[in-house]
From Swiss-Prot:
The gene is ndhB1. It is a multi-pass membrane protein. It is found in: Plastid, Chloroplast thylakoid membrane. GO terms for molecular function: NADH dehydrogenase (ubiquinone) activity; quinone binding. Its EC number is 7.1.1.-. It comes from Zea mays. Its main location: plastid. It catalyses: a plastoquinone + NADH + (n+1) H(+)(in) = a plastoquinol + NAD(+) + n H(+)(out); a plastoquinone + NADPH + (n+1) H(+)(in) = a plastoquinol + NADP(+) + n H(+)(out). The chain crosses the membrane at residues 24-44, 59-79, 99-119, 124-144, 149-169, 184-204, 229-249, 261-281, 295-315, 323-343, 354-374, 395-415, 418-438, 484-504. NDH shuttles electrons from NAD(P)H:plastoquinone, via FMN and iron-sulfur (Fe-S) centers, to quinones in the photosynthetic chain and possibly in a chloroplast respiratory chain. The immediate electron acceptor for the enzyme in this species is believed to be plastoquinone. Couples the redox reaction to proton translocation, and thus conserves the redox energy in a proton gradient. This is NAD(P)H-quinone oxidoreductase subunit 2 A, chloroplastic. The keyword Lipoprotein does not apply. Keywords: Chloroplast, Membrane, NAD, NADP, Plastid, Plastoquinone, Quinone, Thylakoid, Translocase, Transmembrane, Transmembrane helix, Transport.
Amino acid sequence: MIWHVQNENFILDSTRIFMKAFHLLLFHGSFIFPECILIFGLILLLMIDLTSDQKDRPWFYFISSTSLVISITALLFRWREEPIISFSGNFQTNNFNEIFQFLILLCSTLCIPLSVEYIECTEMAITEFLLFVLTATLGGMFLCGANDLITIFVALECFSLCSYLLSGYTKRDLRSNEATMKYLLMGGASSSILVYGFSWLYGLSGGEIELQEIVNGLINTQMYNSPGISIALIFITVGLGFKLSLAPFHQWTPDVYEGSPTPVVAFLSVTSKVAALALATRILDIPFYFSSNEWHLLLEILAILSMILGNLLAITQTSMKRMLAYSSIGQIGYVIIGIIVGDSNDGYASMITYMLFYISMNLGTFACIVLFGLRTGTDNIRDYAGLYTKDPFLALSLALCLLSLGGLPPLAGFFGKLYLFWCGWQAGLYFLVSIGLLTSVLSIYYYLKIIKLLMTGRNQEITPYVRNYRRSPLRSNNSIELSMTVCVIASTILGISMNPILAIAQDTLF
C-alpha cells in the first residue's frame, strides 16, 4: 500500500515537472528557435540511423549541414531584436550572444565537409561523429546565451563531454586514446576549479545565481570588494584559462591536437575558443564589475605568457598539428587584448572581428592538413617539402592561410591584428601591444619556414611522401577542397571588406 502511494506521488511529481517543462518550451521556445532546429536535426539523425540499413549515406551529412544552415538563417532573421530574458531568467537573447552563436554555427558548418572523406577513409561510424558535433554545437550555443551559473555549467559540460568523445573518436588509435584521457582529466579538473569559483560568487552574493542579480547581491551584502571576490576571481580565471588554452594552463593542448583526428582538431580549435570567449567576456564583465582592475591585470599576465610561450614553442615543432596547437595559444593571447579593452575602445568589436578572420584562417589551414594527410599519411612538417611541384593549388592555399595567420598584408589576418592592436594602443596597453607585435613578427618566421619548404623544387629535399603524392584533378568534387576554397577566399578578401563587419560587431554591446 505504501509503495503504491509512493509510486503515485512519483508519477504525479514527474507529470508536474514534464508539464512545467512543456509550458516553458511552448511559451519560450521561439527564443531558442535556432537551438530547437539543431535538436530536431539530432532526433532526425537518430531516427534514420535506427531505421536504415545503409549506414554510410549522404543523408546524414545533408541533414546535419541543413540543420546548421537553417539555424544560421533563423539567427540572422532575429538580428537587431530587443534583448530578451527567457526561461525564468536562465537564458538571455541579445546581439552579443547571437554573434557568438553565429560564429559557432559557422565553424560547425565548415567543419562537416572536412570530415566526409576522412570518415570514409578511416571507416569510422558516421552517425556518432555527426551527433557529437551537433550536440557540442548545441552546448556551445546555450553557453553563449546562459544567464545563470547553473545553466552556464550544464551547457559547458554538454560541450566539453562531446569534445572528449570526439577526441577519442578513433578508438583503435593509441595516440587518440591517450589524448582523450589527458583531455578528460584536465577538462574535468578545470571544470571543478571553475565551479568552485562559482560557489564563492553564490555565497558572497547571498545565494544569487543570475549574473546581474549576483552584482546586486554583492552590493546588498557589501562584499564586492572583499577578499572572497579575489578568491572567486582567481579560481574562475584559472578555469577559463584551461578552456581557452592560455599559458600556463595550455599543457593539454599540443597532445590533444596531435592525438585527435584532424577534422576533430579543426572543430575544437575554433568552437571551443569561441564558446569560452563568450563565457569569459560576460562572466568577467558582469559579476566582477567592481574588480575590473584586478582581472585586467590577471588577463594581461596570461596574454603575455601565451603570446611569448606559444610562439617560441611553435618554432621548435616538427609536427604540423603540434605547431598549430602552440600557434593557437599565441593567437588567443592576441584575442585577450580585446577582452581587456572592453567596450570603451571597441575592444569587443575588434575581438569578434578577429575571431571571424581566425575561423577562416585556421579552418583553411586544417583543411589543407586533412587533405595532405589523407593523400600521404604523414603530419611531419619536413614531408611537405616540394608540395608545390605536385599540387600547386593545395600548396598555395596552405601558404595563403599561414601568411594570413602571421598577419601579412593585404590578407585578412593583417587587418584583424591591426585593428585589435590599435584598440589596445588607444586604451593605453602599450606594453601588451608591443609584445603582441614582436611575437607576431616571430610567428611569421615559422610560417615562412613552412612556406619555403612547400615551394622548394630541389629533388634532394623532396620526401618520398611528396614524390608518390596523388595529384588531384583540376575540377574536384572533394568536399574538403570546397571547404578549403571557401576559407582561403575568406582569409584573403575579408580584410578588404572590414568596415561592414566592424559595423555589425559594434552593434553587439550587451
